[in-house]
C-alpha cells in the first residue's frame, strides 16, 4: 500500500480551537493554517510545522486612521433614481433615497460642482453648473428650472463609511457590539504612506507568519446596500468604488481629456460586464490596472524583504488587480487564493498566470448560515467539490482550503469525514497530473467585448450566482471549464488589430444577448470584425453562436452573421418575407440528447434561412440549427444551461463545427455523466463519475480502443495508458 499523501490543504483556526485544529490538520493532512475575518491565530499554533497564513487588510480595521482622515476614506460613484419634472418650478432630487445611510455618506468635502453631475436623461446632456444647487441639510439636489416632463438623475461621490464586506459578515453572523469598519483609500498620499509604514511594522511584530494573505488590496468591487440593509447593487467586477478626486485628477493628466462622472456611472449601468465598454471606461480601467499594480508591488516587495510570501485573495478589494491583464504578472505575487463556486470560478483562479501557486477556498464557508441545526453542509460540500472537480482535472489549483469558524464545522462529524476524503482525492489527482497540461484536442476561442481580461468571467454578476438572464449562457463556460480543449478568450479589439488571430482556433464561440458585452453589439457593424469571422469560417473554421450571436440590426439583418449561422431573428421588419424552412433533422450533434432539450430561456422568433438544417424548434421558434458556410460549419443554439446532457451536446457541436467528428472518440465516454482526461506527462488517465449514482459506460482511449467500465457514485479511477 502506497504512503498516504499529505499537504496542499489549508484549514481555519481560532484562539479557542488549538487542540481541535491540530486534530483536523492531522486528519485532513493540512500543511497550512489561516485566520479569518472575526478569528485570530493562537500563538501556540504559530510554532506548528505548518505554513501560517495571516489575513491582512490594507483598507480597513483601522478606524482611528479613517476617522482622523475623512478626506481619504474610500469613495464610490452613485446615481439617484430617475425623477421627472412633473410641474413648472424647481425639482428636488434626494440623493440617499433607497440607500443605506450607515454605509454611505455624500462627499461634500471635495468640490461637488467639479465631481458631481446632473444629467437630463431625456436628452442625455449634463446640466450646466449654475442650473442646480445642493441642499446639504436635506441631502437634496435642486434643479432650478427643469424642462417640463424631462427625466433627471444626479451622479455623486459618496464616502464608504461601512466596509461592505465587513457589513455582510456582521449581518450574516449577527455580530453584536462590533464597531463598523470604515474603508480608507490606500491610493491617496497620506494613507498610502501610513499603510506602507504600518505593513513594515507589522512584519517585525509578526515573525511567525509565513504568508501574508492580502484581503485584498485597494478597491472594493461595487457593492451597495439599500435602506433595509439588503443588497441593492452588486458587480463583482465593478470599478465604481475605485474613485476619488485625487485618482481622477491623475487620470485626467494621463489621458488628456476632462473626466465626467458619466464615464463611471454609464447611465446607471456602471460599466458592468454585460455592457460593451466605452473608450473612456477602457482608458480608466487601463489606468487603474497600472497604478494598482505599481502600489501592489511596493507591498509585495515589503513581504519579500521580510522573507514572507505574498498571497492575494481574489475578491473583496481586488478591483484594478486584473490577474488576466498586462500588469499583474509584474507585481511578483507568490499566490492567489479565491472562492470556488463552480467549475468556471475554479478556472478563474487556476488559469491565473504569473504566480507560483493558486489556491481554491472551497464551500461551504464555516458560517452559521449553513452550519446550524437542520443545516446540510455535507450536501453543499459534495455539490461544490464534484462541480469544481471537472475543472480541476483540466487546470488544477495547487492547493485547496476552507474558511470560517472551525468550531461550527466540528458539530458535523460526517462533514469532517467527507472533507478528509476530498483532501485525499485532491492530492492524488494533483500528483497524477504531474503539474503538466492535460491532453487537448484543439483550441476553442470565446469571442466577446472583453477578451482575456474577463477570462471565465463573462455572464457573472455576483460571484458564482445564476441569474434568469445569464444561466442559459453561463452554461457554455461551465461546460468548457471541464472539457479537453484549450480555451482562449478573444476580444473584438484583438480581432480588429489582428484579424487572423481566429485562425489559431478550431472553433470560435459567441454567446449572449443582443447588444451586451458578451455578444458584442455595435462591434458587429465593424467590417474588420464581421469579415474576419466570415473568412475564418469560410476557410474551414467552426463557429457556434448561442443566444443572440452577432446581433446588431444593420443593413437588413439582425444577426450580422445570419448567412454564416443559417438563422436570423424576426424583429418585425421582415415579416412580409415568407419563411418556408421549418423541417427538423436528426444530426450528429443531438445523438446523445433526449427528445426534449433544455435550452433554458430559449429564444423567440428565430427562423432558418434556406440551406440551413433545423435540429430543434419550438413551434416556429428555431432553437438549434446547423449550416455550411464555404468550407466551414456553424451551429446556432438558443441557450445552453449547464447540465451533463447539455455539456455533451455542446461537446459534439464543437467537434462537428470543427469538422473533426472522427476525432471525438478519443479519451471519450459513451455515458455523458462520465468524463475522461489524459495526462501525457505521467501517462495516466482518469475516468470520473460526475453524479451521485453508480454509472456504466464505454470508454475510448487515445487509440480509439473501447472497453466497458462501472463506477461508483462520484468515483474517480486512475489508470496508466499503455500504447502497445
From Swiss-Prot:
This protein's UniProt keywords: Carbohydrate metabolism, Glycosyltransferase, Transferase
Biological process according to GO: carbohydrate metabolic process
Domain of life assignment: Bacteria
Catalytic activity: beta-D-galactosyl-(1->3)-N-acetyl-D-glucosamine + phosphate = alpha-D-galactose 1-phosphate + N-acetyl-D-glucosamine
Catalytic site: 316 (proton donor)
Identification of the protein by name: 1,3-beta-galactosyl-N-acetylhexosamine phosphorylase Cphy3030
The protein's Enzyme Commission number: 2.4.1.211
Pfam families hit by this protein: Lact_bio_phlase, LBP_C, LBP_M
Entry annotated with the keyword Iron: no
Lineage of the species this protein comes from: Bacteria, Bacillati, Bacillota, Clostridia, Lachnospirales
InterPro entries registered for this protein in UniProt: Class_I_gatase-like, Glyco_hydro_b, Ig-like_fold, Lact_bio_phlase-like_N, Lacto-N-biose_phosphorylase, LBP_C, LBP_M
Family note: Belongs to the glycoside hydrolase 112 family.
Keyword tRNA processing tagged: no
Organism: Lachnoclostridium phytofermentans (strain ATCC 700394 / DSM 18823 / ISDg)
Function noted in UniProt: Reversibly phosphorolyzes beta-D-galactopyranosyl-(1->3)-N-acetyl-D-glucosamine to form alpha-D-galactopyranose 1-phosphate and acetyl-D-glucosamine. Active towards galacto-N-biose and lacto-N-biose. Does not phosphorolyze galacto-N-tetraose or lacto-N-tetraose. In the reverse reaction has activity toward N-acetyl-D-glucosamine and N-acetyl-D-galactosamine, but not L-rhamnose, D-glucose or D-galactose.
Enzyme kind, highest EC tier: transferase
GO terms of molecular function: 1,3-beta-galactosyl-N-acetylhexosamine phosphorylase activity; 1,4-alpha-oligoglucan phosphorylase activity
